[in-house]
Amino acid sequence: LNPELGGKVLPAGSYILATQVLEKRLRQRLLPQNMAVCDQNVALDYYRLSADGRLLFGGACNYSGRDPRDIKAFMLPKLLRVFPELAGTAIEFQWGGMIGIGANRLPQIGRLKEYPNVFYAQAYSGHGLNATHMAAKLVAEAIRGESRGFDLFSRVPHMTFPGGPALRSPLLALGMLWHRMKDLL
């Protein structure tokens, strides 16, 4: 990464389980409004029904840089805390990957100071599917010279994570452990 940006984003693992297709009555009982839901924890969990009737349950940010050996074993207890009635339901798919997280959890959109013709958009903090479309539009408009929205986002300050490359991830893991403990209380 460019040195100007490198310390502003940390990688974190995020994981998702997909159940077998659920019966219609069960789906209606679990999510009667068929809406996407997330909790209010710092490292949030989220869930929704897929178009074919599966429950998709995701979250469990992992800041260690290592993926769990078994995503299902890692995520299933979280799913069952929210939906105990799904005990015994088959998990047919599981996947995960790295996301980029910024300290303030806001997308980082701007241009490099040293190379003002180089634009960047990063650190969607798990909201990339939604925010990348907006960021791409803002960057495209800025390239065309219409930069009002781009300029607004590029003025948002983004701190560099403390600790330098060697301590950045361990310090974040400690900080997130603190927030996790608060979430549990």
Question: What are the language-model segments listed below?
Answer:
Residues 1-24, 28-116:
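Active-site substrate-recognition segment that forms the wall
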Residues 114-120, 124-185:
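C-terminal lid/capping helical subdomain adjacent to the catalytic/cofactor pocket in oxidative enzymes
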